[in-house]
Design a protein with these regions (language model features):
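A short, basic N-terminal segment
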Residues: 1-47, 70-73
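Mid-core helix/loop region of P-loop NTP-binding domains shared across ATPases and GTPases
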Residues: 2-9, 14, 44, 64, ...
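Walker A/P-loop nucleotide-binding motif
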Residues: 43-68
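Conserved catalytic segments around the Walker B and adjacent sensor/switch elements
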Residues: 50, 74-91
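AAA+ ATPase "lid" subdomain C-terminal helix
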Residues: 240-246, 254-267, 307-310, 328-330, ...
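Conserved C-terminal helix/linker of AAA+ ATPases
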Residues: 259-284
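Short alpha-helical segments that sit at the start of domains
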Residues: 282-314
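Terminal-proximal interaction/regulatory segments of ATP-powered molecular machines
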Residues: 307-393
């Protein structure tokens, strides 16, 4: 059966897609341009080494690749031959010979993969650059895998190429990319010092930048009016709990779109986000639900009902209390006070079942807003009904 897709171009959500501009990384981009500005004025007189660090999903690879495109244009305007080469070291198990071979094949596609030592292939690379009269930035992504495999000797080989060749044009500069500085501890002091002279550190994204990033991808990847703003906010909040991981946020947006399309939905609803994240992260722990009291379970059932029946991403406690009162009638129970229910909500938030935030004055006053971010409402409702049946036998 074919489904009406809400996607316009889902390739814009692919992990390898490089946007024209990396949002909220202007400072880091300016630093990269400044460190390598010599390439536009005196490219043969110096070589540069920059270490870019940041946790998963902070945009390390994207900002370096975007910089590579920009610097290539700027250097080209000066009539200088230049290439930005990006190699993921982990793809080659940190083997320096294979990494250098990959760089060589940029210029000689059929260069033999075997039969050369590390020193020989490095010299071959330098010779090719000299013959081609070209300058290069070699960006080594996941550089920690090379450090783990090769140690200080590899760092020396790469960073001290021109120490004894001052008269020759210095044609290679480096960008080293890794998550943090910890892998450098295995290197000797001299190698550590060489790598830590120029460091660009990417901080984790907070919620608002993630919203901007998601909205940018929504415009590119989805049809108009198929991704409501509260869905974008929900995904951004979830990604914030995953250490500000933009990659996670974009994947969750894509998965949510897939769940919506599979249901022939006209837009992504919060429930599809909950379904998508429950497929990525185990969310509902039966032991946690079993440990709740009767009225806690009834309040949680009220939350599940609200989000099952409404397409909103957030509710107020007043919304939930109305449904809770109906459930109390169904089970012939006297409703608990507002204060006690608020304490239950706080407990739910503590164990990760719900999230709370203060609502904006412009929308629903300063009341506390409640969301069910990671558990599909229907799944939670079924689980609670099953428990009620077992407990009342």
């Amino acid at each position: 059966m074919s489904h009406q897709s809400i996607f316009k171009d889902e390739s814009k959500l692919d992990i390898n897609y490089l946007p024209n501009r990396i949002l909220h990384r202007d400072r880091e981009n300016r630093l990269l341009m400044e460190f390598f500005s010599f390439l536009t004025s005196c490219p043969d007189r110096m070589s540069q080494r920059v270490l870019v660090i940041g946790e998963v999903g902070t945009g390390k690879t994207a900002i370096c690749q975007a910089f590579g495109k920009n610097i290539s244009i700027e250097v080209g305007k000066k009539g200088t031959k230049f290439r930005y080469i990006h190699v993921n070291c982990r793809e080659y198990r940190g083997n320096l010979t294979q990494i250098l071979h990959q760089a060589v094949t940029v210029f000689q596609q059929h260069f033999p993969a075997r039969g050369y030592s590390t020193g020989e292939i490095l010299n071959t690379f330098l010779q090719i650059l000299e013959e081609e009269q070209v300058f290069v930035i070699l960006a080594l992504d996941e550089f920690d895998s090379l450090i783990e495999k090769e140690g200080s000797d590899a760092v020396y080989a790469l960073t001290r190429l021109y120490e004894t060749q001052h008269e020759k044009p210095q044609r290679i500069s480096f960008i080293f990319i890794q998550r943090n500085l910890t892998p450098l501890k295995v290197l000797d002091d001299s190698a550590q010092s060489t790598l830590q002279r120029n460091i660009i550190s990417l901080e984790r994204y907070t919620k608002d930048p993630l919203i901007d990033i998601l909205n940018d991808r929504v415009k590119l990847a989805f049809e108009i009016a198929t991704v409501p703003e509260d869905v974008v906010e929900l995904i951004a909040e979830l990604a914030t709990t995953e250490l500000g991981n933009a990659r996670f946020a974009i994947e969750l947006l894509w998965r949510s779109g897939k769940y919506a399309t599979a249901q022939d939905a006209e837009r992504i609803e919060p429930e599809y986000v909950r379904q998508a994240i429950s497929a990525i992260i185990p969310t509902i722990k039966r032991s946690e639900l079993c440990g709740l009291g009767l009225h806690e379970k009834m309040l949680l059932l009220a939350i599940a009902r609200f989000f099952k029946e409404n397409k909103e991403a957030f509710s107020t406690l007043a919304d939930i209390e109305e449904i809770y009162a109906v459930i109390c009638e169904e089970y012939d129970e006297i409703p608990y006070s507002h204060t006690q229910l608020w304490k239950y909500i706080q407990r739910f938030a503590h164990i990760g079942i719900v999230k709370t935030k203060v609502g904006s004055a412009a929308t629903r006053g300063r009341s506390t807003m409640i969301s069910l971010p990671t558990i599909p409402a229907q799944e939670l409702e079924i689980e609670l009904y099953t428990m009620f049946k077992l407990e009342r036998r």
